[in-house]
Amino acid sequence: MERNYRKTRVGSVVSDKMDKTVVVAVEDRVRHPLLNKIIRHTRKFKAHDEKNECRIGDKVRIMETRPLSKEKRWRVVEIMERAR
């Protein structure tokens, strides 16, 4: 699989307690087919952070990668915005 075709997501870091791993919450907005109401779906991904740079509240871009552990299939590409 080429890097160009890998999925990317933008989310915020909700946990950085693990070594070289962060939990990123990604929010999707979907329209309910019957109610026509916008609903927020939040999914959490474990992402690889090689240098332990991410902190809670940072806005990051993650990219799909090969399985790195039992639950880790994403890696942090860039920190888009630092938490205040």
From Swiss-Prot:
Gene: rpsQ
Swiss-Prot/TrEMBL GO biological process terms: translation
Molecular function as annotated in GO: rRNA binding; structural constituent of ribosome
CDD domains found in the cross-reference section: Ribosomal_uS17
Keyword Endoplasmic reticulum: no
Purpose: One of the primary rRNA binding proteins, it binds specifically to the 5'-end of 16S ribosomal RNA.
Family as reported in the entry's similarity comment: Belongs to the universal ribosomal protein uS17 family.
Record text on subunit structure and interactions: Part of the 30S ribosomal subunit.
Keywords: Ribonucleoprotein, Ribosomal protein, RNA-binding, rRNA-binding
Record-given protein name: Small ribosomal subunit protein uS17
GO cellular component terms, semicolon-separated: cytosolic small ribosomal subunit
UniProt key word Zinc: no
InterPro entries: NA-bd_OB-fold, Ribosomal_uS17, Ribosomal_uS17_bact/chlr, Ribosomal_uS17_CS
